[in-house]
Amino acid sequence: MAAAAASLRGVVLGPRGAGLPGARARGLLCSARPGQLPLRTPQAVALSSKSGLSRGRKVMLSALGMLAAGGAGLAMALHSAVSASDLELHPPSYPWSHRGLLSSLDHTSIRRGFQVYKQVCASCHSMDFVAYRHLVGVCYTEDEAKELAAEVEVQDGPNEDGEMFMRPGKLFDYFPKPYPNSEAARAANNGALPPDLSYIVRARHGGEDYVFSLLTGYCEPPTGVSLREGLYFNPYFPGQAIAMAPPIYTDVLEFDDGTPATMSQIAKDVCTFLRWASEPEHDHRKRMGLKMLMMMALLVPLVYTIKRHKWSVLKSRKLAYRPPK
């Protein structure tokens, strides 16, 4: 067989490596039987030597596979731990009247909401960034706001003797704080610090929907859930345990305008008031937007006409070069 291969190589390559015509070479190769002529090129030998994986490579691939599987399991475990917050109820989206593009706040509801804050919320929560003058023209007249401010005593001074004194509140005074400092607030609320309500609606995900759901979402803890003393179950609060007792209930107060003081009505009014406190420029911003749209309706056709009849002439103008003769 080796002799046959040598003779065939000699026939194909010829003397001194000279090749024969392609047709003759192909004919000789095709006439040879596979069993009689086991030719192996260098490329085939190289591929056959790499077809099998060594023991070290197999061990490395196995280790990488186990590492990938472990990483996937760890990622799933961490994802499950992070998704534990899904146990908290997400507040639904309520149809607030001021959510339209051109809708304003209900100022009657703002007035009732301020009454709720004054009689229910102000005993624990402060509003450091809202003054009595901000109520003028929104839900109270100037005289009414002055009367409200005069009901509180504000520390002022020093006087001529260098001493601080108390005086009736004025329009430029801000709402009084229920506690002198945060330490006193924590001491009076079992270690919990009541948040400031000036920007509470803008500071919470969900806005007024979250505040409304929190105020009306108190319920008994489910079976198997135990709370320590001083905490209340609320599914909308992170952790479901809140230190604030249910602040509102039906007929907790009487509105000045005679509106029935149901729990949902009280929560709706105080949320509207807190929405205004978080964004006092709400109505002004929408009025400016409406004025801008009206101005744009007049300016856009004018600009389009100028572009078509003035700029298009300049844009389509061509310059021709005429060399001097």
From Swiss-Prot:
Q: State a GO cellular component annotated for this protein.
A: nucleus
Catalytic reaction equation(s):
a quinol + 2 Fe(III)-[cytochrome c](out) = a quinone + 2 Fe(II)-[cytochrome c](out) + 2 H(+)(out)
Q: Which residues lie on this side of the membrane: Mitochondrial matrix?
A: 316-325
Q: How is the cofactor bound?
A: Binds 1 heme c group covalently per subunit.
Q: Where in the cell is it found?
A: Mitochondrion inner membrane
Gene3D superfamilies documented for this protein:
Cytochrome c-like domain, Cytochrome c1, transmembrane anchor, C-terminal
Any single GO BP term:
response to glucagon
Q: How does it sit in the membrane?
A: Single-pass membrane protein
Going by the entry's taxonomy, the superkingdom of the source organism is recorded as Eukaryota
**Keyword Ribonucleoprotein recorded:** no
Which Gene Ontology MF annotations are present?
heme binding; metal ion binding; ubiquinol-cytochrome-c reductase activity
Can you give the residue ranges of the Cytochrome c domain?
108-209
- UniProt subunit comment: Component of the ubiquinol-cytochrome c oxidoreductase (cytochrome b-c1 complex, complex III, CIII), a multisubunit enzyme composed of 11 subunits. The complex is composed of 3 respiratory subunits cytochrome b, cytochrome c1 and Rieske protein UQCRFS1, 2 core protein subunits UQCRC1/QCR1 and UQCRC2/QCR2, and 6 low-molecular weight protein subunits UQCRH/QCR6, UQCRB/QCR7, UQCRQ/QCR8, UQCR10/QCR9, UQCR11/QCR10 and subunit 9, the cleavage product of Rieske protein UQCRFS1.
User: What is the purpose of this protein?
Assistant: Component of the ubiquinol-cytochrome c oxidoreductase, a multisubunit transmembrane complex that is part of the mitochondrial electron transport chain which drives oxidative phosphorylation.
Q: Please state what the protein is called.
A: Cytochrome c1, heme protein, mitochondrial
The taxonomy runs:
Eukaryota, Metazoa, Chordata, Craniata, Vertebrata
